[in-house]
Amino acid sequence: MARKGSVSQRRVLWLQVFGLAAVQGAIALTWVIYNLYLEDLLVTLGFSAALATTLLVIENAMGAVMEPLMGSFSDQRQHWVGSRFPQIALGMILAAICFLGIPLVLLVGSSVKALLPITLVAWALAMTVFRSPALSLLGRYAFEADLPQAASVLTMVGGVTGAMAPLAGDFILGMGPLAAFIIGTVVLLSAAFVLRQVHPNQSVSAAASLETNAATPWANLPWILGTGAGVALGLRLLLGNFPAAVAKTGFGQPKLIMGALFLTVAISALPCGQLATRLGNRLTMLIGLAGLVVAAGLTSLMATPGIAILVAISIGIAFSLIGNGTLP
C-alpha cells in the first residue's frame, strides 16, 4: 500500500502537473497585463516613461535575490510542516491584492501618485514569494527522467499566454486598466484554488520527494539561476528589438510574427519535452541556447517577411528547448 502523499504507480502525476500549469498560466497572464499597462499607468500619473525600464530592472534584480530565498524558506516549511502550499497560497493572495491595487491607485488620482511605484514593486515582490516554491513542486510530480515531459506542459501554457501580448494586446488595452487587472486578479486566485483542489502535496514516491527536496535544488541552483537569468535577459533584449527588425523587412504587422513566435513555443513544447527526455535536459538546453544565439544573429540579416517568419519559428523552438530545463 502506498504511503499517504505518494503515488508510486505512476511516473508523472498529470493532474497535479495541470494544476501547476494553471499557476504558470496565471503568472504569465498577470505579467502580460502588467507589461502592457506599465508605461501608460506611469505616464498618466505624471511619471516619466523611462521609469518603466527602471522598475523592470529593479523587479528583475529583486527576483534574482528573493526567489532563491523564498525557495529555501519553502524547503524548510516542507521539512517541518510537510507542505509548501501555505506559502504558495499566501504569496498568491498577497500578489492578487497588490495587483488589484495597481489600477485603484490610478482611480484615486495624482494625490496618491507616489503609491503607484510602491504598489508596482510590492506586487513584483509578492510574486517572488510563491513562484519558486510553486514551480519546485514539479520535482514531486515526475521522476527525474520524466521531468522534461512534465515541464513541457508548463512551457506550452506559458507560450499560449505569452502570445496574448502581440495578438490580443489591443483588446486587453481596450478593456481599460481596472477591468484588465480585475481579470488578472481573478485568474490568479482561481489558479491557487485549482492547485489546492488537485492535492499539491502528492508525489510520485516518497523517496523521490525526499531526494528532490534535499539534494536536487541546491545541486542545480547555480545552473538554474545562471541559465534562467541569462536567458531571460537575452530574450527580453531580443524580443524588444525583434519587432523593429521585422518592420524593416516591409511587413506591416510585426505583431503577427511575434504571435507566431509565442505560438511556436506552445506548439513545440511537447515535442521538445520528448526530445529532452531522450537526450537529457542539460544537453537539450545547450542545443536550445546555441539555436537562440544563431537566431539572434540572423535577426540583423532578415531581408524579407518570409525570413522573419522562419527566424521567429527558430526562436520559438529554441526557447521551448531551453524553457523545459530552466523550470525548477
Placement of each model-derived feature along the sequence:
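Glycine-rich segments within core transmembrane alpha-helices of 12-TM secondary carriers
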Residues: G63-A64, P148-D170
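Hydrophobic core of transmembrane alpha-helices in multi-pass small-molecule transporters
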Residues: C98-V105, S110-F130, I307-I322
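Intracellular juxtamembrane helix-capping segments at the cytosolic ends
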Residues: T128-A142, L321-P328
